[in-house]
Amino acid sequence: MSAQDKLIKAQHLIDMNDIIREGNPTLRAVAKEVEFPLSDDDIILGEKMMQFLKHSQDPVMGEKLGLRAGVGLAAPQIDVSKRIIAVLVPNPEDSEGNPPKEAYSMEEVLYNPKIVSHSVQDAALADGEGCLSVDRVVEGYVVRHARVTVEYYDKHNEKHRIKLKGYNAIVVQHEIDHINGVLFYDRINAKNPFEAKEGMLILE
């Protein structure tokens, strides 16, 4: 039984046991493009990946399943070497603690996503990045593009082109790196981890 066959079973909920860790060769492989029209198996896998992210961000389900909270998941992280990523970025509460009008600033499963253009300006998260496939803290600025234009297909086989900036751009770049065999710490300057080149945007 392939990893995907196990993951898409109706009763299966993706948990931390399904997520492979650094050292596994799947994380360093360039994943294969999915074919269109999408197979039911690839659609279900995308839905399961999104379900995992929602569970991971839910305090009750997260604790029940022992999940680390995540905002993105790429198919290679669950040992399926395909170009599929899921992104779920929640909007914050307002200054008075009221819930946001829109729960998520980005909620999408992207098939065969690719960056078609990007800004000259770089950006990095002030607190660095983490990864569900990396069980250790790696400090430093993960240098990325401040703005990107991404093309992808959705589960209905429809093509989209979106412009992203800020945190959403960072998350999508992190996940696209996964389908290209790149891990976040590859983008940290090993000699000077917190080097900020002139003009680089540091996102708090």
From Swiss-Prot:
Family matches, as NCBIfam families: pept_deformyl
Lineage: Bacteria, Bacillati, Bacillota, Bacilli, Lactobacillales
This protein's UniProt keywords: Hydrolase, Iron, Metal-binding, Protein biosynthesis
Residues at which Fe cation binds: C131, H174, H178
Cofactor(s) in the UniProt record: Fe(2+)
One Pfam family, short name: Pep_deformylase
The UniProt record lists the keyword Heme: no
Annotated InterPro entries: Peptide_deformylase, Peptide_deformylase_sf
GO MF terms held by the record: metal ion binding; peptide deformylase activity
Details of cofactor binding: Binds 1 Fe(2+) ion.
PANTHER family: PEPTIDE DEFORMYLASE, PEPTIDE DEFORMYLASE 2
CDD domains: Pep_deformylase (cd00487)
EC code: 3.5.1.88
GO biological process terms held by the UniProt record: co-translational protein modification; translation
Gene3D superfamilies found in the cross-reference section: Peptide deformylase
UniProt-recorded name of the protein: Peptide deformylase
Known function: Removes the formyl group from the N-terminal Met of newly synthesized proteins. Requires at least a dipeptide for an efficient rate of reaction. N-terminal L-methionine is a prerequisite for activity but the enzyme has broad specificity at other positions.
Active site: residue positions: E175
Name of the gene: def
Catalysis: reaction(s): N-terminal N-formyl-L-methionyl-[peptide] + H2O = N-terminal L-methionyl-[peptide] + formate
Similarity comment text for this entry: Belongs to the polypeptide deformylase family.
